[in-house]
From Swiss-Prot:
One annotated Gene Ontology cellular component of this protein: cytoplasm
Biased composition (Basic and acidic residues): 641-653
Keyword Membrane appears in the UniProt entry: no
Positions of the catalytic residues: C1215
Biological role stated in the UniProt entry: E3 ubiquitin-protein ligase. Functions in the OLL neurons in the anterior ganglion to inhibit avoidance to microbial pathogens such as P.aeruginosa although worms do display avoidance behavior, vacating a P.aeruginosa lawn within 24 hours. Likely to act by inhibiting the neuropeptide receptor npr-1.
Annotated metabolic or biological route of this protein: Protein modification; protein ubiquitination
GO molecular function, one term: ubiquitin protein ligase activity
Species assigned in the record: Caenorhabditis elegans
Protein's name in the database: E3 ubiquitin-protein ligase hecw-1
Catalyzed reaction equations: S-ubiquitinyl-[E2 ubiquitin-conjugating enzyme]-L-cysteine + [acceptor protein]-L-lysine = [E2 ubiquitin-conjugating enzyme]-L-cysteine + N(6)-ubiquitinyl-[acceptor protein]-L-lysine
Length: 1247
């Protein structure tokens, strides 16, 4: 029964695992007052595994069980009572049992009830501390004076899985009403699933009001509470009626001392046994009455011999108050005999002597008729086999029934949680019938095939699909869907005096039929078949006297099982039928074994050989034509021979199917591609030029985007999984293909175009072929190289190793490009890019042949080429600087500066050095009070910190333009020497930052960068910095300006007054027209760029060019100069992590490293730049990304090194871009230490 209900007074509170960390001595000392302890225990160091408390017996006891010993206290034992167990000693009024030696403890006088209360309350206090639940509680409140007080102590539990609560008075009436009130409190305050209770608490006499009347409503409420529990045990249930029994909504019920009549009990048994209810699976009723078991047995068709067999094997003693232990002994025997009883008594009723009735749920049934199906499923494939395998080669989904197929797979491919197995119609693979994800399943996957999910498919297969690309990785053998089948009987085992009949819609068929068959020991071996479609089956057993003994009904879906048994209550008739269900291939019955033996002597035609399969059926094999068939070759017309499917080595029990033949009675499309030669049409889809042709053909592109069938067909043709002819029955795909045909050209020679049933058909009279594909489909010319060996493209070679990383890191840019250029497929591209972001290189490899991703790659290539061009400009610029030996001379400039007076020190040091020395010398920086060597890190930080102060708008020399906080020179006069020196210092700092490849922490407008290069500005340079000016000039470009009467004059507000300045000599009289408005706008832009800043810009450029010749900047665009000076604003976390190296025991999967990157993700962008400044000495990132981070003279990637202990702060080596990170204990500790280091760690020292 598994979880059996306790039908006797166990009387223990089982508190497992509560006292794990306490010894027996500690528990005893805590349970009683110190003045009650007379001696200490000798077993003081034994941990407790469980504790049992029994208060519902005449002699209450407490038992504690340890690992190797147990201790038992028995309260109030008479002196004359002795224990017989080994190791039990009696000392006064207290006894204990111990398997090991120990010192005895005793007490002479104590209050029994108070002692028990002390123990209970202490246990409750333990429960409160441990937040546990009571797994089982059994307590007799009859021995407790104040039972309500005891119960209220249990409020700490909140949940009691099993509760046994009684009032055993032992002949003395005491506190009955208090017990009832205690029960009310328990039901209202505790969650109880199983209850074992004296039922008299539910009687009206137990709920008397103060005036002596009965409270019927309270009684009913208590009874409803009991009925909602899973298991109940009702004692004193003499008021229970048969109607109450039928209303029981429980799993287990036990009724003791009831007054049910024989009629009530029999009626309940009959009604319940005939219902389908599975709620009540155990009922035990005890009482003085005797019910008519013969009547029940007769009504249930129970045989006398079975009942007698039962009685002789199960002894149960009558329960009586004089011998309460007798019933317990009987139950022990019952428990040991229950497995045997299940075999002897198959039905769900146990009747044992008159006073006990036990009802079980459905059990294993003894068989009267057994049907065993042969060869239903194949075994699991061996581990060495690769592919996808199925357990059945044919299924029989009769009516609304279903059949289960197991699918195994073994593929030499890395596991991907997106892969799935689909069920496909073999005749139309454009969509799946059912699918299961491999993320939630392990091999095998179980598919349930029904008529609903199979639709009209006659043959299906299972395919393993790549979740990234939709590519078919493996395909199973075909599974036949048999909607018409034959039931083949192979063997019948039965007594000789019994005839077996099958009752179907074809009539009554005897098994075996009246013909010659072998017969041995009552076993009839035969092999014959009859039509069996969707009907249910009746099997009748008839004795020779034609008296019907048994008629068993078998539903059609049961025949799909491997093993079927009928219900039986007798061992006298046992019949076993071995059968199989086969596809209905012919009206001719399969020959039996005797016929096979005789027919095998007939020589078949030449080249044909005869074989027997696993079921002893004959089939024929032609090794020349590689054909197999079930019928003799000489019985068919040679003009209509249809080759049949070869018998597979693993699925040899299925018949061949004629639909595998390529020759059919009617005219069909041939396997060859009829539009153009097969290879040409396949190559059309497989060539790379097809992608270009697709995106150039807007109509075809629309069909491709909207129809998944078309995309699926293209994929299968490209992978040589299916020929193009397979999809000719898809009009939309045919239309898609024909959109690539050049209809301006005539049809090829021998071709004709006709219309049939509103569809265009192309006829090839030369080859006598028909096709729906236009033969004028575009063909791509194959380009041949004149050279024997070709040199790979420099661009593709350079980017081959970086394309995966570039695609992963630039997914967001690709989404924007796709949205701008291809909005109709942007959403689909975005979904695939999400897969790439999630699964990285695995997704890139899987989607390499996807058309959408191919387009994304082409967009990335164009973008990459653009970036490569820009990178080439910067690389050329640095090569030119290297030739000029700028910043690489033999001399060295060692500058010692203070962080507190950085700007003053820069004025004092930089302006006092000759410009020629500045541009030729190497640079080394030292911060005052800090011991450090400059290998690049200190110089980078020097320029970052200096630029923040030097170019700050608060000084009045620069101001913010636009909304992006880019700086531009502020209009002002430069009359004082200080102003001139400030601008000279600005020019020199900018030039030195470029020479020493150090970034500054400011960004300028495009106008300023072009001014440094002495290049004219354009209108686009003002788009971000001065949006109003840009919109005004752009409006003039797009509209007619004749009516505006504008002249070549620049107007501006100076000191609150309108000031005008001619753009050209005589500009006030020269009007703006459509012909010269472009010139006007260009002049306006040039004037706007230098208006008010002529003098400051001249001073800054002079000092800048003294160090960096403007000729060197000719190879750069303004965007290049911006990247050289300020780096990139983009901070790609994926690029950062990808280009990080680890030392000292760290790796990318180390837990501390994982915490570090998780902390980085939670930081703001400003905090991340501060971290970069702390580690690298620069708060900017090279425009090439983190892969281009530089150390002293070469590339030096970001590095995380394990160093120090958990109490240390992180530290950095800015010259080598190295962060020394201790191995912290928690992520929170790492985050706190890192933040403190960034904020307070801007100083250097030498180890």
């Amino acid at each position: 029964m598994g979880d059996e209900f306790p039908f006797h007074h166990l009387g223990y509170v089982c508190l497992n695992e509560i006292y794990k960390h306490l010894t027996l001595k500690e528990i005893f000392q805590l349970s009683f007052s110190s003045n009650q302890i007379k001696r200490s225990l000798g077993i003081a160091s034994i941990p407790v595994k469980s504790i049992f408390v029994n208060f519902d017996s005449q002699y209450p006891k407490i038992k504690l069980i340890g690992e190797s010993s147990q201790l038992e206290w028995v309260f109030g034992i008479p002196d004359g009572l002795e224990y017989t167990d080994v190791g039990v000693y009696k000392i006064g009024h207290f006894k204990f049992q111990c398997k090991t030696s120990g010192t005895a403890f005793y007490t002479e006088h104590y209050d029994l009830e108070n002692a028990m209360l002390v123990v209970i309350r202490y246990m409750i206090s333990i429960f409160k501390c441990s937040n546990s639940i009571i797994t089982y509680l059994s307590i007799d409140l009859g021995v407790i004076e104040d039972s309500r007080a005891i119960c209220e102590n249990f409020v700490a539990f909140k949940k009691v899985e099993r509760l046994s609560i009684f009032q055993t008075n032992y002949g003395v009436e005491r506190n009955t009403l208090n017990f009832a009130q205690s029960f009310d409190w328990i039901c209202d305050n505790l969650e109880i699933k199983n209850i074992h209770i004296g039922a008299d608490v539910l009687e009206p006499k137990m709920v008397q009001k103060t005036n002596g009347e009965f409270d019927i409503k309270l009684c009913a409420r208590r009874f409803e509470q009991v009925l909602t529990m899973d298991h109940i045990y009702l004692q004193h249930a003499d008021w229970i009626t048969s109607e109450d029994l039928l209303n029981l909504d429980v799993q287990t019920a036990m009724l003791i001392e009831n007054n049910l009549t024989e009629q009530d009990l029999n009626a309940f048994i009959k009604q319940w046994l005939r219902s389908d209810s599975d709620k009540l699976w155990w009922l035990e009723v005890k009482g003085k009455m005797m019910f008519n078991r013969e009547e029940v047995l007769k009504d249930l068709d129970v045989q006398d011999d079975a009942y007698r067999s039962l009685n002789t094997r199960w002894y149960v003693a009558r329960r009586s108050r004089a011998n309460p232990s007798g019933n317990g002994c009987a139950r022990k025997k019952m428990g040991s005999l229950r497995p045997k009883l299940t075999e002897l008594w198959p039905f769900k009723v146990y009747i044992i002597f008159g006073s006990i009735l036990i009802v079980f749920g459905p059990a294993a049934l003894n068989r009267m008729i057994t049907l065993r199906r042969m060869d239903v499923e194949t075994d699991r494939p061996s581990g060495s086999e690769t592919g996808i395998f199925v357990s059945k080669s044919a299924v029989y989904p009769f009516g609304n029934k279903n059949e289960v197929v197991k699918v195994w797979w073994n593929i030499d491919k890395p596991e991907n949680c997106l892969d799935w197995i689909g069920l496909f119609d073999n005749n139309d693979s454009s969509f799946y019938l059912d699918q299961k994800s491999l993320r939630q399943h392990i091999s095998p996957v179980v598919f349930t095939l029904t008529s609903k999910n199979l639709l009209n498919a006659s043959e299906v297969y299972f395919g393993l699909i790549d979740g990234m690309t939709g590519r078919l990785l493996a395909k199973s053998e075909n599974v036949e869907i048999c909607k018409s089948a034959s039931l083949v009987v192979h063997e019948v085992k039965k007594p000789e005096n019994i005839n077996v009949y099958l009752n179907t819609n074809h009539g009554r068929i005897e098994i075996p039929k009246k013909r010659s068959f072998s017969r041995k020991n009552g076993s009839f071996r035969s092999s014959f078949e009859f039509d069996f479609d969707v009907e249910d089956l009746h099997i009748s057993l008839v004795e020779n006297s034609e008296k019907l003994n048994f008629d068993h009904f078998i539903a059609s879906n049961q025949l799909q099982n491997n093993y079927i048994q009928s219900k039986s209550f007798s061992h006298s008739h046992v019949v076993e039928i071995v059968f199989s269900i086969e596809p209905k291939t012919s009206k001719k019955s399969a020959p039996d074994i005797m016929e096979i033996a005789s027919s095998s002597q007939t020589p078949p035609e030449s080249h044909w050989k005869t074989y027997l399969d696993a079921k002893k059926r004959k089939f024929y094999v032609n090794h020349v034509t590689k054909e197999t068939r079930w019928t003799k070759p000489d019985t068919l017309n040679n003009n209509h021979i249809e080759p049949e499917t070869p018998v597979h080595k693993r699925l040899s029990d299925r018949s061949a199917s004629p639909r595998n033949s390529f020759i059919t009675p009617r005219r069909t499309i041939t396997v060859r591609s009829a539009g153009c030669p097969k290879s040409d049409l396949i190559q059309f889809f497989q060539r790379d030029e097809f992608k270009t042709a697709l995106y150039e053909n807007q109509d075809a592109m629309q069909i491709y985007n909207e129809c998944s069938v078309v995309r699926h067909a293209i994929h299968r043709i490209q992978k040589d999984l299916d020929p193009p002819s397979k999809f000719e029955n898809q009009p939309l795909f045919v239309r898609f293909v024909n959109l690539f045909a050049d209809i301006t050209q005539p049809l090829p020679s021998g071709w004709e175009c006709i219309t049939m049933n509103n569809r265009t058909v192309f006829l090839n009279h030369a080859n006598k072929e028909t096709s729906f594909y236009d033969p004028r489909i575009r063909r791509f010319e194959t380009k041949t190289s004149r050279r024997g060996r070709s040199v790979p493209s420099r661009s593709s070679t350079a980017h081959k190793g970086k394309i995966d990383h570039a695609l992963i890191s630039k997914c967001e840019d690709l989404r924007k490009i796709a949205q701008d250029n291809f909005p109709q497929i942007a959403e689909r591209i975005s979904k695939k890019l999400m897969l790439i972001e999630r699964f990285g290189g695995l997704a890139v490899a899987s989607l390499a042949n996807d058309l959408d991703i191919t387009l994304a790659l082409s967009m990335l290539d164009s973008n990459t080429e653009k970036l490569a061009g820009e990178g080439d400009n910067i690389k050329m610029f640095y090569e030119d600087m290297k030739k000029e030996k700028l910043g690489k001379g033999p001399s060295r400039l060692c500058w010692k500066v203070s962080r507190d007076r950085l700007l003053d020190d820069a004025f004092r040091i930089i302006l006092n050095v000759d410009p020629f020395v500045l541009k030729k010398s190497r640079l080394h920086i030292r911060f005052e009070g800090e011991l450090a060597l400059d290998y690049g890190g200190l110089s980078r930080e020097f320029f970052i910190l200096l630029s923040r102060e030097l170019f700050h708008p608060k000084n009045g020399y620069f101001e913010y333009e636009g909304n992006d906080y880019h700086l531009q020179l502020r209009p002002r006069g430069c009359e004082t020497e200080k102003e001139k020196k400030w601008l000279i210092l600005c020019g020199r700092v900018l030039a030195l930052a470029v020479i020493h490849r150090c970034y500054i922490d400011v960004f300028f407008t495009n106008v300023f960068y072009k001014s440094l290069q002495k290049r004219p500005v354009t209108l686009m340079d003002f788009k971000e910095s001065d949006a109003e000016f840009y919109k005004s000039m752009n409006w003039l470009l797009e509209n007619d300006v004749v009516d505006l009467e504008m002249s070549f004059v620049y107007s501006s507000m100076v000191n609150g007054k309108l000031a005008e300045q001619e753009l050209v000599p005589g500009g006030e009289s020269q009007m703006v027209t459509e012909a010269n408005k472009a010139e006007f706008i260009d002049l306006m832009c040039q004037k706007k760029a230098i208006r008010g800043v002529e003098k400051p810009l001249e001073i800054l450029l002079t000092s800048f060019n003294q160090i960096l010749n403007d000729n060197l900047l000719n190879s750069l665009e303004s965007s290049d100069l911006k990247r050289i000076l300020s780096g990139s604003l983009e901070l790609d976390l994926n690029d950062w992590r990808t280009n990080t190296i680890y030392k000292g025991g760290y790796s990318d999967c180390h837990i501390v490293v994982e915490w570090f990157w998780e902390v980085i993700e939670t930081m703001t962008n400003q905090e991340r730049f501060d971290l970069l400044l702390f580690v690298t000495g620069s708060s900017s990132v090279p425009f090439e990304g983190f892969s281009a981070l530089r150390g002293n003279e070469e590339i030096s990637k970001f590095c995380i090194e394990k160093w120090g202990d958990a109490t240390s702060f992180p530290r950095a080596h800015t010259c080598f871009n190295r962060l020394q990170l201790p191995s912290y204990n928690t992520k929170q500790q790492l985050k706190s230490k890192l933040q403190q280091a960034i904020v307070n760690g801007m100083s250097y020292s030498i180890e």
